[in-house]
Amino acid sequence: MTTLFISDLHLDPSRPEITDLFLRFLREQAPGADALYILGDLFEAWIGDDTPSPAADAVADALKVLSDSGVPVYFIRGNRDFLLGEDYARRAGLRILPDPCMIDLYGRPVLLQHGDLLCTDDIPYQQFRAQTRDPAFQAQFLSQPLAARIAFAQKAREASQARQSEMKQGDRAQFETVTDVAPSEVDATFARHGVDTMIHGHTHRPAIHSLQAGGRACTRIVLGDWYEQGSVLRVDAGGWSLDTLARE
């Protein structure tokens, strides 16, 4: 049997081809799996479970079919969909996990996380993350009318895009460093949790890294985004493979 891991689909009505690919994946490849783990940024943006979205409804329906068939579907919130709540999770049959979390994967302890906690060189983002993960902030934000939340999200996205553009136009090497994981934080995370295998997304740099951390041989698996093609990690008792999914 096989366990599947995906992240960073960034589903959005403006990119229906990605949603179509994901729905096909749920119909054709996920059934019969031991489990499906979605490690954040399933959606491009999420400003509350009460936001009308036919596309999100279709995704929830497809996930619920998979879950009802006996395939557990686990979800870790990402930096784009950290406000996804219990109401949508119930409709979609999702089991929300903390970030990070430990699982037993065919006898191997593995640490799962979205991945943004590893990007400690991006100090402004980490400050924003701390603010927006505060329960009081989230409760206040979600209590606002939908129009106000939409306006806030649009303003935040524009500010983020402007900052990214400014960084890219400056020191490109510095941009690549800041937006990737910090090696020191990777080492500290392996040591903190006492594991030798970690799976995460967020950086959109799919790879399987072999490294030394604290004198131990460790593996860090990075999931890919779905902008140009799908990306799925398949794990069984014999090992793992990081595969791509082509659009029709």
UniProtKB/Swiss-Prot annotation:
Chain sites annotated for binding Mn(2+) 2: D41, N79, H114, H202
Membrane topology listed for this record: Peripheral membrane protein
InterPro entries (UniProt xref): Calcineurin-like_PHP_ApaH, LpxH-like, Metallo-depent_PP-like, UDP-diacylglucosamine_Hdrlase
Free-text comment on the cofactor: Binds 2 Mn(2+) ions per subunit in a binuclear metal center.
Annotated Mn(2+) 1 binding sites: D8, H10, D41, H204
Keyword terms, alphabetized: Cell inner membrane, Cell membrane, Hydrolase, Lipid A biosynthesis, Lipid biosynthesis, Lipid metabolism, Manganese, Membrane, Metal-binding
GO cellular component: cytoplasm; extrinsic component of plasma membrane
Pathway of action: Glycolipid biosynthesis; lipid IV(A) biosynthesis; lipid IV(A) from (3R)-3-hydroxytetradecanoyl-[acyl-carrier-protein] and UDP-N-acetyl-alpha-D-glucosamine: step 4/6
EC number: 3.6.1.54
Catalyzed chemical reaction(s): UDP-2-N,3-O-bis[(3R)-3-hydroxytetradecanoyl]-alpha-D-glucosamine + H2O = 2-N,3-O-bis[(3R)-3-hydroxytetradecanoyl]-alpha-D-glucosaminyl 1-phosphate + UMP + 2 H(+)
Entry protein name: UDP-2,3-diacylglucosamine hydrolase
